[in-house]
Curated annotation (Swiss-Prot):
Gene3D superfamilies: 3.40.50.20, ATP-grasp fold, A domain, ATP-grasp fold, B domain
Name of the protein in question: Formate-dependent phosphoribosylglycinamide formyltransferase
GO BP: 'de novo' IMP biosynthetic process
Tree of life domain: Bacteria
Entry binding sites for Mg(2+): E265, E277
Lineage: Bacteria, Pseudomonadati, Pseudomonadota, Gammaproteobacteria, Alteromonadales
One GO CC term, this protein: cytosol
Gene name for this UniProt entry: purT
Function: Involved in the de novo purine biosynthesis. Catalyzes the transfer of formate to 5-phospho-ribosyl-glycinamide (GAR), producing 5-phospho-ribosyl-N-formylglycinamide (FGAR). Formate is provided by PurU via hydrolysis of 10-formyl-tetrahydrofolate.
Coiled-coil features, chain-numbered ranges: none
PANTHER family assigned to the protein according to its UniProt record, in alphabetical order: FORMATE-DEPENDENT PHOSPHORIBOSYLGLYCINAMIDE FORMYLTRANSFERASE (PTHR43055:SF1)
Assembly mode: Homodimer.
């Protein structure tokens, strides 16, 4: 049962993280009559702008997190980022709090160690070789064992922060320092992974719902500096490789438990599929589904977490997304060139309405459909390039 916002019978959902992905989740929640409470570390975050009300706290502060949850008494807590005091969610779930998809899934996936050990050591899924390191000495030993090239990431980071590829050992010291600076919770433990010379990488959006496991068409994407630049759907792949990908994704999602949409990242090399990472929430590469599917990843996530069934997911055809990435410093961001950006048919634009920029930041995404993937990607890139950001 869903009541009406601001009434005694309202169904209340609390978003922990109010960025562009959380904003789309909030929109879908409101379409189904759910009262939305936004929580983030800074004011006027994108989802806060449309939430029924919001709070600014340090979500890594266990006391502050518990206090805001006890104040609002949400029926659902929906983590949208990694930087959260997840042990508090585990404790409060044991007290009766409903965490999406589960507090365990949120805790395991907030850092790369929990999910990598689950995938490789518990589930026996194929992954790259890896070591976890607490000190620079352990870090250098791991590099000597794995060899170069190898990939270095903080165990807790997102959007490529702190990630680098070591192509020769002379880059080791710089990579260690960069990883220490890039972690969401400060410096600390890192993972060193063997580099898989993959043919392509995909995100397989996997939904666990009341009526079973469902998959979106595979999404291909291009990464730069550890962050996505373009994504497209569907990624061309053989039926055999797709079946292997779905089998891996199913195992991971079922092991994590709960209802919701999961972004499962996989590497494909020939006919081999390797598990990379998973997010128990909508994925940034999945922004393409805003134009590629009848139900976006956000709509699917909300249906699943509300205990509603997932029907057949209709994919409209070759589609792509391209980010609007800007570097600068401003608290008065403005946009022009929108008419040109939207002049071509089957194009859309999402401006995230982030309140400020200090450095490099993703401020929007262009979306496009066309006759084939290359045409769709080029159309999305052209649209994104025409957006002019004024400081």
């Amino acid at each position: 049962m869903i009541g009406t916002p601001y009434t005694e019978g309202a169904r209340r959902a609390m978003l922990l993280g109010c960025g562009e992905l959380g904003k789309e989740v909030a929109i879908e929640l409101q379409r189904l009559g759910v009262e939305v409470i936004g929580v983030d570390r800074y004011p006027n975050a994108p989802a806060m702008q449309i939430a029924h009300r919001s709070h600014v706290i340090n979500m890594l502060d266990a006391k502050a997190l518990r206090a805001v949850i006890e104040l609002e008494k949400p029926h659902l807590v929906i983590p949208e980022i990694e930087a959260i005091a997840t042990q508090t969610l585990v404790e409060m779930e044991a007290e009766g709090l409903n965490v999406v998809p589960t507090a365990r899934a949120t805790k395991l996936t907030m850092d790369r160690e929990g999910i990598r050990r689950l995938a490789a050591e518990t589930l026996g899924l194929p992954t790259s070789p890896y070591f976890f390191c607490d000190t620079e000495t352990e870090f250098n030993q791991a590099i000597s064992k794995i060899g170069v090239p190898c990939v270095v990431k903080p165990v807790m980071s997102s959007s490529g922060k702190g990630q680098s590829v070591i192509r020769n050992v002379a880059q080791s010291a710089k990579a260690w320092q960069y990883a220490q600076e890039g972690g969401r919770a400060g410096g600390g433990r890192v993972i060193v992974e063997g580099f898989i010379p993959f043919d392509y990488e995909i995100t397989l959006l996997t939904i666990s719902a009341v009526n079973g496991i469902h998959f979106c068409a595979p999404i291909g994407h291009r990464q730069e500096d550890g962050d996505y630049r373009e994504s497209w759907q569907p990624q061309a792949m053989s039926a055999d490789v797709l079946a292997k990908s779905q089998a891996i994704a199913s195992k991971v999602v079922e092991a994590l438990g709960g209802y919701g949409l999961f972004g499962v990242e996989l590497f494909v090399k020939g006919s081999d599929v390797y598990f990379s990472e998973v997010s128990p929430r909508p994925h940034d590469t999945g922004l393409v589904t805003l134009i590629s599917q009848d139900l976006s990843e956000f709509a699917l996530h909300v249906r699943a977490i509300l205990g509603l069934p997932i029907p057949n997911i209709h994919q409209h055809g070759p589609s792509a997304s391209a980010v609007v990435l800007v570097e600068g410093k401003s608290k008065n961001i403005r946009y022009q060139g929108l008419a040109a950006a939207l002049a071509a048919e089957n194009t859309q634009l999402r401006l995230f309405a982030k309140p400020e920029i200090d450095g490099r930041r993703r401020l929007g995404v262009a979306l496009a459909r066309d006759k084939d993937i290359d045409s769709a990607v080029n159309k999305a890139l052209d649209s994104a390039a025409k957006v002019q950001v004024i400081f």
